[in-house]
Each structure stands twice: as C-alpha cells, then as structure tokens.
Amino acid sequence: MKHHSLIFLTGFSGSGKSTIGPLLANSLGFEFIDLDREIELAAGKSINRIFAEDGEAAFRELELRTLERIGSQKEMVVSLGGGVLENDRCFELIRRTGTLVYMKSSPEILSLRLQHKTDRPLLKGPNGEKLSREQVEQRISEILEKREPRYQKADLIIVTDSKKIGSTVEEMTRKIERHIRRVERDS
C-alpha cells in the first residue's frame, strides 16, 4: 500500500540528502532514517565491508530487505543511497510504497561539494588515487547520465544547487505537504 507520507529522498552523493533529510523530517514532524545506516546496523558492519566481504549482490539484497521493512511506515523521511534506484526491485518498491523526491544538483556543484570527501570510491582513480576536480566532475556527469531516467520518474524534483539549506527545507516542506494533500484528495 502506498503511504504518501513515506518520503524517499534520492539524488547523487552530495545533493544534500543527509544534511537536509533530518531538517526536512523535523519540519514535517516526521522521523528520519538513512537507508545506508540502517543497512549497516542490520549487517553489523560498514557498507564498504559488506561490499568487500560479501559482494554487491549481498548488499543489494540487504538494501531490498531493509526497504521492504521501511515500506510499511508512515510519516518518515528516508535518505536513499546513490545507486538504490538502479535496482529494479528497489525502484518499484519505492514507487509503490511512498513519495519519491529527487534532490537535483549539477555536476559542477556536486564536484565542489564532494572534492574534500575521502570516503567516496567514485572520487578515486583505479589505483585509489585522488582525482582532479575536472575528473570528478566528468565521472559525476557519466553516472548522472545513467541514473537520470530513474531520477526523472520522481514524484517531486527539487533543485538544490544554489539555495541555502533553510530555503531548500522550506521549499521541500511546502511541495511535499501540497503533494500529500493533492494525492489524498484525489484518492
């Protein structure tokens, strides 16, 4: 069953999901959870360790099981991992159970936000070396091109490039509340 007050935040790493998510949840009076953190708690180890020790298939299965558990919740904001929508089963589950919000940012802004992060595999070369900002921006563009068709299927799209955090939270709160009211009225 679809719960329109179950809000899934998607977007590229650096789009603001983890920063804005808790503030948005507070503004809406909802609970906040980070999907990756929930997976780590369930597995008892970090996502990097899950990938290294168990492989991507095991991680994707944990991701799906965690989403299935979350899918029955209401009044919750869930920050999704960057690649979750690439998994067809996860994508369909999210679309079927909640409201998907795409936090859209340009490759230029994302590369600026991510340039000092050292824990992101996408920011490293094949031998673990740090990439230049231009290389990071190019890599982000390539990944976004692949993910964009799924991102565009979101119920709401919010551009997070040049806004202050507070105004982004206000805009998202307004749009989500309006969306929930409209969908509930039309049901």
UniProtKB/Swiss-Prot annotation:
Name used for this protein in its record: Shikimate kinase
EC number annotated for this UniProt entry: 2.7.1.71
Amino acids binding substrate: D36, R60, G82, R147
Localization (cell): Cytoplasm
Source organism: Chlorobaculum parvum (strain DSM 263 / NCIMB 8327) (Chlorobium vibrioforme subsp. thiosulfatophilum)
Self-association and partners: Monomer.
Cofactor comment text: Binds 1 Mg(2+) ion per subunit.
Residue stretches in coiled coil: none
Keyword annotations: Amino-acid biosynthesis, Aromatic amino acid biosynthesis, ATP-binding, Cytoplasm, Kinase, Magnesium, Metal-binding, Nucleotide-binding, Transferase
Role of this protein: Catalyzes the specific phosphorylation of the 3-hydroxyl group of shikimic acid using ATP as a cosubstrate.
GO-annotated molecular function: ATP binding; magnesium ion binding; shikimate kinase activity
Binding site for ATP: G14, S15, G16, K17, S18, T19, R120
Keyword Magnesium: yes
Gene Ontology terms: biological process: amino acid biosynthetic process; aromatic amino acid family biosynthetic process; chorismate biosynthetic process
Organism phylogeny: Bacteria, Pseudomonadati, Chlorobiota, Chlorobiia, Chlorobiales
PANTHER family documented for this protein: SHIKIMATE KINASE, SHIKIMATE KINASE 1, CHLOROPLASTIC
GO cellular component: cytosol
